């Protein structure tokens, strides 16, 4: 029977072995031996391999493809239990990683990969592992080509923490040079226990190593024992020339026919000894007693007792065949041994072996009258057995076989029926569906919704499809073909995708067509051709990665693995739909109609052109992502119109041949059977997890989901196309489909199932780069050292966001290959128990700063209020504030209604304070939205939602009052920031907190003045705040030093007071500006100097004279009896007298006398200040011009007045002294200023400052 005719019950899932992060790879260099037998094993400073990218196929195989690989499972310890090991890089690197699918709940994951680099290449067939019962460690043994025996002990922490290997392994790594290898060549290594090893030699003998536990530090760690097939005599005669037995040449060594090609070790439950089974080159099986070194049994592996001794070559086994025997223990003292003979067509043989405590053994043929031959190949190519495994099932032994033809392989399973001795193999071989090379790329054209480059990038960079080394090597080889490759070219700073696009893009140019325009069709065709070349090169390289190396069966979990050169394939059981699909030509009797329906849909869609496929997918996207209010019939008609089907009679005839005329086979029951195939029958996924999946196990699930999604989508998509076309083409004369069953219901269920698959497809193809500290996976990678914590790892969205839901449930007693299928089927089912909350995924993406990915999930979002709110958060993060506001307004009612139980899950996007604002009324909800926009500084939307919050806020309770205060504050701030001063003014007047109101009033005035909105400021009423506005502006005026630059507060206050008819106040503030102008020396800048060109200006027109005119004009607007100003008297400047220079040295005594004669009704502080100014003025003059007695008298008077006023100042605030200036005084001062300017122009300068009578009419008041 050919492979293709086997019933397919299983499906393989290939895993890419490329690490998710470079930091998870630990490079350990094993140095040569030292004088004490210990190796120097140190950790590399870099977490990345030092080897460069291979630029040809040979270098690619050397650096990236393993020559030997398998999985070792420990017996005594389970955390971790399985280890995948690979021999790489010309046999110089032994790579080991944990390969457990599940882990104990409280045990940390082990994500690290240890690469042990040896100085001398290893012998791939001489690598072994052991597990000590008393020590939780992995014992690694290896023999290199320099005949050194390496012994390395790896603890679980070595696979969990980088820090465990930073200082090297120390005494955990040892090397030994056996003297027995001096004249014998090792061929196979068999590990009996951590303390006992066996090496088979080229001459048929064995070398046993027993650990010397009592040896000193300088002694030998192993005790050697040599045993031979025919004793020492025969062995020595073999060394004599011309007297040797027939040999086989292998790797430059002449192998004796008694040498072992394949070995297996078992104890059969005996603690005292072990038994070594060897399949030798002479086609015989020998059983050794490891304890004594005696051969207990010798026999042909096919139990052929009639072999011709002269036909030695016919029955010779190739020395490279190292997988010819497997042992299955069946209890104490007995086991089942399965051997395979590669001679001829190949044949399996089953042996029952019994052993007693005395060391004797009994071997019998289980089925002497039955033969199990190898299945026939699928073609003329030769298929050979690469490996096989035996497992115990309730119905009997189960045989798994791996067949190989170059880089292709097949896996088959055979259930043995021991009770049927005459026909134990009657159940027949069952096949495993091997993954196809990849989807066939469809042609690109104007009908494609995406660019051709984007299509190819999506295909090439599909998660888990190609490794980075494969892409880099293919690109280098492609460049070599173009003649543009340079070894020195550095791609630093460029990603591999960018490099590929750059190289392929350089081969295509946009030329002009014959009509003179751009020839886009030619450009597209040329680009497509180059991409197809690169794609084929990738497939050829990737095909080498799939070369099978070994087959492993996990007895504990019931899982089958195929290790390949650069891949690992997990064999899982097919779901019902997968089983039906892969056996479509020979379905089971109960599924014949469903198989016909599926076959009809697939056959119909296969006839579509590439453009028709794209149109159908575009119509489907609109149907999946749009919420339509149309009826089912209208929706199907709209789908037909959008797709624009063009079906020929021949294409439709194929469908009718399958489903019958008038679709008589199509019934509601048939569609129910179809939906049952994609519905999970187990509720195991909804139970509590007993053993969560590891990072490695999650990769298996994700890859299986990718395959299942594509298969389900292909079948359901074809069924949808078939359904709408059957409805469209049905005849009213016959009985139409819609009269037989509810076609609309089937249509909706197909759409819902496809929508679920599209959601999963997005999650399995979208990769996230996440730092270990932000992982949702809990213990996925908690043990990376500080050096690795800064490096991110790449995982799919499904693995990162839903990986914590993957695991084995409490009640699960099924094999792992079935449990994985059930989990995957439940994930893909429309009625899955695993709910993929789109809003929760979007919250996590927003928390991680990926709103672009969150936007892609919007078509899958639900329509509930919180989901709508999350969509608003997505657009808010993308700074699409208007769309975000629409979603926030839509969700307002639903998120403002109080609920008894609120599910507070947002992946950390919302804190407790924000949650408290939801479902607690519209004011709180809108206040929360205001906070969100405020963080984005979107002040126009802050204003909008602040108004909404204020609209619904009730002032009857304290909470609403606080919300009102906060919203008024936010409204004011936003309005001020956006220069909506009228809105800010309204918010300011509505504030109840006077302190807050005054603070914001100051901010508003400052903002309006700084932005030049003084006219709008004056137009605002400021009801009840006018005095405060005047006061704040007056403070700003007093604080202003430079009145010519900066904000013109004096002019603003002048205009404010003029608008409120306060002419005296307006004149007073300008008088202050006049004084500051005079102090700054503006009065000395004459008009001719102050002009732009220094000529053509009035010399009397200065800043000071103009200011005098404005003040005089302001006072002229009031009644004459009110035309005065109360001016603050500034403190004098020492040595310069008062502001108006009215106090001269010669008139000081008269002024002091006048001050002493002043009525006691005057303000005491004013008199003290006046006296102080007089004293300061006199101290600056000539001390000889005044009597000392008068000065002392004045000083004593000032001290008494200051002491007297101390008590008064404690009760009353100290006031600034002021004086009265009438309109006549200002005009007089203006005239004096003009005279002074004229005198300066005429070069007339006074030598003294007399003029003591010029201010006789001025009165100082308080």
Swiss-Prot record:
Record-linked PANTHER family: NUCLEAR PORE COMPLEX PROTEIN NUP160
Record's GO cellular component terms: nuclear membrane; nuclear pore
UniProt feature, compositional bias: Basic and acidic residues: 1165-1185
Subcellular location: Nucleus, Nuclear pore complex; Nucleus membrane
MF terms (GO), sorted A to Z: structural constituent of nuclear pore
Stretch list, region Disordered: 36-58, 770-791, 1128-1196
Stored PROSITE patterns: WD_REPEATS_1 (PS00678)
Subunit record text: Component of the nuclear pore complex (NPC). The nuclear pore complex (NPC) constitutes the exclusive means of nucleocytoplasmic transport. NPCs allow the passive diffusion of ions and small molecules and the active, nuclear transport receptor-mediated bidirectional transport of macromolecules such as proteins, RNAs, ribonucleoparticles (RNPs), and ribosomal subunits across the nuclear envelope. Due to its 8-fold rotational symmetry, all subunits are present with 8 copies or multiples thereof.
Gene Ontology biological process terms in this record: mRNA transport; protein transport
Gene: NUP120
Name assigned to this protein: Nucleoporin NUP120
Keyword vocabulary terms for this entry: Membrane, mRNA transport, Nuclear pore complex, Nucleus, Protein transport, Translocation, Transport
Naturally occurring in which organism (per UniProt): Chaetomium thermophilum (strain DSM 1495 / CBS 144.50 / IMI 039719)
Listed Low complexity bias regions: 770-786
Source superkingdom: Eukaryota
Topology of this chain in the membrane: Peripheral membrane protein
Location, primary (coarse class): nucleus
InterPro entries: HEAT_Nup120, Nucleoporin_Nup160, Nup120_helical, WD40_repeat_dom_sf
Pfam family, one: HEAT_Nup120
Role according to the record: Functions as a component of the nuclear pore complex (NPC). NPC components, collectively referred to as nucleoporins (NUPs), can play the role of both NPC structural components and of docking or interaction partners for transiently associated nuclear transport factors. NUP120 is involved in nuclear poly(A)+ RNA and pre-ribosome export, in GSP1 nuclear import, in NPC assembly and distribution, as well as in nuclear envelope organization.
């Amino acid at each position: 029977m050919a492979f293709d005719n086997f019933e397919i019950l299983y499906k393989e899932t290939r895993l890419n072995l490329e690490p998710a992060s470079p930091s998870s790879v630990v490079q350990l260099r094993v140095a040569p031996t030292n004088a004490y037998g210990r190796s120097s094993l140190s950790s590399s400073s870099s977490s990345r391999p030092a080897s460069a990218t291979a630029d040809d196929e040979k270098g690619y195989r050397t650096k990236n493809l393993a020559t030997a690989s398998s999985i070792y499972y420990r017996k005594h310890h389970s955390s971790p239990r399985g280890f995948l090991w690979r021999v790489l890089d010309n046999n110089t690197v032994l790579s080991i990683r944990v390969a457990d699918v599940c882990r104990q709940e409280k045990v940390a994951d082990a994500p690290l990969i240890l690469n042990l680099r040896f100085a001398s290449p290893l012998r791939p067939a001489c690598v072994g592992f052991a597990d000590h019962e008393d020590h939780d460690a992995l014992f690694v043994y290896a023999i290199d080509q320099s005949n050194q025996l390496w012994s390395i002990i790896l603890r679980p922490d070595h696979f969990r923490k980088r820090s465990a290997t930073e200082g090297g392994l120390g005494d955990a790594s040892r090397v030994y040079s056996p003297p027995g290898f001096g004249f014998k060549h090792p061929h196979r290594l068999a590990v009996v226990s951590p303390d006992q090893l066996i090496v088979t030699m080229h001459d048929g003998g064995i070398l046993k190593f027993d650990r010397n536990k009592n040896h000193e530090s300088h002694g030998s760690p192993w005790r050697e024992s040599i045993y031979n097939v025919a004793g020492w005599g025969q062995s020595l005669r073999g060394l004599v020339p011309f007297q040797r037995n027939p040999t086989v040449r292998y790797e430059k060594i002449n192998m004796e026919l008694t040498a072992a090609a394949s070995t297996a070790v078992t104890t059969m439950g005996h603690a005292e000894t072990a038994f070594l089974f060897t399949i030798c080159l002479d086609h015989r099986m020998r059983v050794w007693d490891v304890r004594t070194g005696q051969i207990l049994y010798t026999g042909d592996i096919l139990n052929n007792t009639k072999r011709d001794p002269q036909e030695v070559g016919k029955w010779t086994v190739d020395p490279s065949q190292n997988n010819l025997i497997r042992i299955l223990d069946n209890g104490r003292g007995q086991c089942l041994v399965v051997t395979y003979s590669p001679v001829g067509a190949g044949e399996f043989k089953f042996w029952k072996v019994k052993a007693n405590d005395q060391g004797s053994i009994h071997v019998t043929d289980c089925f002497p009258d039955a033969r199990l031959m190898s299945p026939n190949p699928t073609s003329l190519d030769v298929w050979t057995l690469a490996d096989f495994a035996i497992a115990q099932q309730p119905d009997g032994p189960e045989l798994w076989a791996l067949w190989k033809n170059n880089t292709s392989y097949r896996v088959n399973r055979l259930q043995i029926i021991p009770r049927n001795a005459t026909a134990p193999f009657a159940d027949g071989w069952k096949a495993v569906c091997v993954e196809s090379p990849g989807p066939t790329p469809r042609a690109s054209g104007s009908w494609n919704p995406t660019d051709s480059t984007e299509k190819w990038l999506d295909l090439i960079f599909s998660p888990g499809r190609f490794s980075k080394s494969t892409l880099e090597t293919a690109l280098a080889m492609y460049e070599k073909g173009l003649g543009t490759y340079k070894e020195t070219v550095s791609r630093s700073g460029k990603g591999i995708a960018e490099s590929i696009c750059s190289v392929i893009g350089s081969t295509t140019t946009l030329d002009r067509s014959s009509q003179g325009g751009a020839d886009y069709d030619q450009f597209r065709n040329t680009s497509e051709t180059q991409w197809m070349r690169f794609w084929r090169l990738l497939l050829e390289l990737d095909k080498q990665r799939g070369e099978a190396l070994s087959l492993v069966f996990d007895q504990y979990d019931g899982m089958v693995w195929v290790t390949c050169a650069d891949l690992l394939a997990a064999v899982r059981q097919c779901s019902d739909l997968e089983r039906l699909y892969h056996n479509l030509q020979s379905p089971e009797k109960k599924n014949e109609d469903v198989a016909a329906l599926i076959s009809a849909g697939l056959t119909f869609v296969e006839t579509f052109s590439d453009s028709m496929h794209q149109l159908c997918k575009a119509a489907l996207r609109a149907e999946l992502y749009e919420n339509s209010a149309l009826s089912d019939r209208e929706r199907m008609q709209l789908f037909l119109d959008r797709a624009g089907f063009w079906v020929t009679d021949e294409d439709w005839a194929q469908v009718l041949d399958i489903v019958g005329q008038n679709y008589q086979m199509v019934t509601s029951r048939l569609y129910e059977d179809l939906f049952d195939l994609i519905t999970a029958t187990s509720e195991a996924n909804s139970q509590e997890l007993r053993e969560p999946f590891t990072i490695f196990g999650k990769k298996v699930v994700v890859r299986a989901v990718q395959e299942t999604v594509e298969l389900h989508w292909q079948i359901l998509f074809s069924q949808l196309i078939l359904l709408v076309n059957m409805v469209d083409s049905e005849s009213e004369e016959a009985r139409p489909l819609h009269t037989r069953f509810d076609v609309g219901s089937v249509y909706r269920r197909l759409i819902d199932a496809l929508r679920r698959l599209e959601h999963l497809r997005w999650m399995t193809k979208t990769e996230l780069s996440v730092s270990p500290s932000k992982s949702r996976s809990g213990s996925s990678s908690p043990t990376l050292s500080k050096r690795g914590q800064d490096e991110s790892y790449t995982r799919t969205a499904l693995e990162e966001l839903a990986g914590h839901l993957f695991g084995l449930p409490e009640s699960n007693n099924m094999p792992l290959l079935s449990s994985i299928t059930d989990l995957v089927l439940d994930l893909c089912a429309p009625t899955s128990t695993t709910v993929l909350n789109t809003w929760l995924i979007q919250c996590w993406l927003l928390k991680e700063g990926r709103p672009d990915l969150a936007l892609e999930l919007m078509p899958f979002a639900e329509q509930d209020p919180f989901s709508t709110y999350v969509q608003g958060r997505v657009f808010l993060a993308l700074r699409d504030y208007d769309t975000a506001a629409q979603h926030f307004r839509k969700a307002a009612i639903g998120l403002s209604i109080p609920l008894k139980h609120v599910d507070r899950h947002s992946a950390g996007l919302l804190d407790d304070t924000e949650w408290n604002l939801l479902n607690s009324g519209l004011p709180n909800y809108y206040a929360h939205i205001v906070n969100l926009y405020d963080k984005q500084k979107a002040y126009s939307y802050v204003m909008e939602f602040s108004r909404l919050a204020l609209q619904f806020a009730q002032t009857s309770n304290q909470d609403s009052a606080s919300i009102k205060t906060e919203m008024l504050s936010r409204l004011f701030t936003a309005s001020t920031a956006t220069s909506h001063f009228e809105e800010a003014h309204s918010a300011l007047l509505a504030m109840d907190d006077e302190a807050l109101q005054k603070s914001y009033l100051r901010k508003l005035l400052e903002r309006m003045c700084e932005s030049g909105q003084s006219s709008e400021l004056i137009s605002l009423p400021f009801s009840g705040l006018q005095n405060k506005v005047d006061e704040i502006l007056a403070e700003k005026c007093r604080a202003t030093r430079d009145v010519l630059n900066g904000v013109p507060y004096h002019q603003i206050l002048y205009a404010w007071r003029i608008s409120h008819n306060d002419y005296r106040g307006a004149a007073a503030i300008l008088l202050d500006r006049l004084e500051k102008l005079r102090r700054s020396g503006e009065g000395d800048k004459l008009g001719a100097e102050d002009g732009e060109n220094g000529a053509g200006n009035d010399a009397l027109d200065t800043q000071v004279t103009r200011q005098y005119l404005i003040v005089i004009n302001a006072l002229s607007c009031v009644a004459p009896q009110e035309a005065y100003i109360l001016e603050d008297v500034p403190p004098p400047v020492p040595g310069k007298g008062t502001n108006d220079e009215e106090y001269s040295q010669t008139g000081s005594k008269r002024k002091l006398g006048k001050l002493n004669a002043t009525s006691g009704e005057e303000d005491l502080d004013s008199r003290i200040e006046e006296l102080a100014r007089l004293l300061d003025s006199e101290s600056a003059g000539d001390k000889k011009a005044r009597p000392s007695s008068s000065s002392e008298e004045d000083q004593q008077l000032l001290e008494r007045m200051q002491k007297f006023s101390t008590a008064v100042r404690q009760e009353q605030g100290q006031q600034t002294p002021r004086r009265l200036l009438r309109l006549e005084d200002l005009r007089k001062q203006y005239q004096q200023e003009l005279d002074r300017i004229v005198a300066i122009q005429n070069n007339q300068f006074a030598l003294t400052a007399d003029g003591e009578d010029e201010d006789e009419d001025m009165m100082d008041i308080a």
